[in-house]
């Protein structure tokens, strides 16, 4: 195994563990049943941007599956899949962000937030509700209400928390041209 693969496997494990812990400890209820404000999606976005789509997918998928299994006894697979897809979609745009070389510019932050809002809308407002209807025979009105609210709260969570995490990470990295030879 090369060093990059090992780094990504370790990142996936750490990301999934953080997803589980934060998801179980910070659960802010909303007026719609079985729909909570979940702060772990900010961490998922951070891992997807830093390590790419594979780590993003598996962090969300494994983290959500294990969190549901521990918390509820069994995973709700359509939502588990969407957590993975959210990490995957955000991770695909990671190379467009110059976080490793030049920090986060306003353009990078705008792109990140446009991508995460679109990914949230596709995942929670389309994939999750249709999956719930098809696989679980859930009522359409219920799952679309849950999906739209999840899109909104997860977009806000990632927009605020994910942006702050990315800014903190970018500031911790040496910037291109910041090191000079004495």
Swiss-Prot record:
Record Pfam families: ECF-ribofla_trS
GO cellular component: plasma membrane
Protein name per the record: UPF0397 protein SAG1634
Similarity annotation: Belongs to the UPF0397 family.
Annotated membrane topology: Multi-pass membrane protein
Top-rank lineage group of the source organism: Bacteria
Keywords per UniProt: Cell membrane, Membrane, Transmembrane, Transmembrane helix
Source species of the chain: Streptococcus agalactiae serotype V (strain ATCC BAA-611 / 2603 V/R)
Main subcellular localisation: membrane
HAMAP family in UniProt: UPF0397
Gene3D superfamilies on file: 1.10.1760.20
Subcellular locations according to the entry: Cell membrane
Transmembrane annotation, as ranges: 9-29, 42-62, 74-94, 109-129, 148-168
């Amino acid at each position: 195994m090369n060093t990059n693969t090992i780094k990504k496997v370790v990142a996936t494990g750490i990301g999934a563990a953080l997803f589980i812990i934060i998801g179980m400890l910070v659960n802010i209820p909303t007026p719609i049943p079985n729909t909570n404000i979940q702060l772990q999606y900010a961490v998922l976005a951070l891992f997807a941007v830093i390590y790419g789509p594979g780590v993003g997918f598996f962090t969300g998928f494994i983290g959500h599956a294990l969190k549901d299994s521990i918390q509820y006894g069994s995973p709700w697979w359509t939502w588990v899949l969407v957590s993975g897809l959210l990490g995957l979609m955000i991770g695909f745009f990671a190379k467009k962000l110059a976080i490793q070389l030049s920090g986060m510019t306003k353009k990078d932050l705008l792109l990140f937030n446009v991508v995460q809002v679109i990914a949230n809308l596709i995942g929670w407002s389309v994939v999750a509700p249709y999956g719930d209807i098809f696989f679980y025979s859930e009522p359409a009105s219920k799952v679309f209400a849950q999906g739209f609210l999840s899109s909104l709260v997860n977009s806000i969570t990632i927009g605020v928390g994910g942006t702050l995490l990315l800014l903190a990470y970018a500031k911790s990295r040496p910037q291109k041209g910041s090191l000079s030879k004495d």
